[in-house]
Amino acid sequence: FEGNQAFCGGFELNSPVQGGNFINVQPFNLASWKTSGFDIEASYQWQRPLGLPGSFTVRALGTHVREFLVDAGIAGVDRIDQAGANTGNTPDWKWLAIQTYDHDAFSITLQQRWFSDGVFGNQYVVCTTGCPASTGNHPTIDFNRMKGAFYFDVGGAIKVNDQASMFFKVDNLFDQDPEPSPQTN
């Protein structure tokens, strides 16, 4: 069990005491994640924009992931930096921008979502000829790029009376298809 005391303490098969042998069936949490990066947020609100009643709010949120190390905690399984791997949830950059006009009788919200270009995975060895032997830790692949995406959403609310409002939301208003991603299942 690779000298790991958490594993070694989970069983005894050569006990000198009669009936002292045991196997403790339990989950072991040896995996770890280490991440670094930063978030940015800014917002501003105008009252009576352009002399109109109500308010106009803009807000932007950004995230940059510099490093996202995943370690299975098992010898023979390589530690992988998944930052920039767009098949998961860790693109290098992602942004969310929101603009809202809010009035007593209604509101309208525009939202933009964007994430940066990336790769399918950082574990791949990219090559076309003279490739090394493909392994579980470092499989070979001839193309490892995934385009980023931009999505535009719109939503709103209408106040019917003091007790009722109606809401609507359309995600991906322009029906932008996601970038194809290779799957194993």
Can you name each region flagged by the protein language model?
Residues 95-96, 152, 164:
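Residue-level marker for the onset of beta-strands and adjacent loop->beta junctions
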Residues 24-29, 78-86, 129-133, 138-143, ...:
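Extracellular loop and loop/strand-boundary signature of outer-membrane beta-barrel proteins
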Residues 66, 111-130, 157-185:
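C-terminal beta-signal and adjacent terminal beta-strands/loops
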